[in-house]
A protein has these predicted regions:
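Charged alpha-helical initiation segments
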Residues: 1-73
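Amphipathic, oligomerization/interface secondary-structure segments
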Residues: 75-78, 82-132
Length: 132
């Protein structure tokens, strides 16, 4: 998407035009408040280091601004993966510094240590909350 003109910065992305909320059996267009409500309750479980909290909140903020530019969802997803990777590094190494390998390796190590649940043998990847 090209840069929006100043006068339309706060208009929803056109892809939100067809998203509706049902309230008391009446359909209405989704608003920024609705979009915010869908994001605000998504949070981290348990205590997380400040660095992880900041990285995760950055992802949520980007997702919020995607209401105005839908393409920001991709940026928000990448930031969320970065927050997940940072959380695994803290859990496995005790700090967010350099850890060997890829996110895949961190997930495998976390499963071996019990930090993440093991994948059920024979299950479909999409049924696994980490792999999906």
């Amino acid at each position: 998407m090209s840069l929006k003109p100043f006068d339309s910065l706060l208009e929803p992305d056109p892809r939100f035009a067809d998203l509706y909320v049902i309230e008391q059996d009446v359909a209405r267009r989704m608003t920024l408040r609705d979009h915010h409500a869908g994001i605000v309750d998504v949070g981290l479980k348990g205590a997380a280091p400040v660095e992880v909290q900041k990285a995760f909140d950055r992802a949520r903020s980007i997702m919020l601004y995607a209401f105005f530019d839908y393409d920001l969802f991709v940026v928000g997803e990448i930031q969320a993966f970065g927050a997940f990777e940072l959380a695994l590094k803290f859990r496995l190494s005790g700090h967010g510094g350099d850890a060997r390998g890829t996110l895949r390796n961190l997930v495998d190590r976390a499963r071996k240590t019990g930090a993440l649940p093991p994948m059920v043998e024979g299950s479909m990847l999409m049924a696994d909350p980490v792999e999906a």
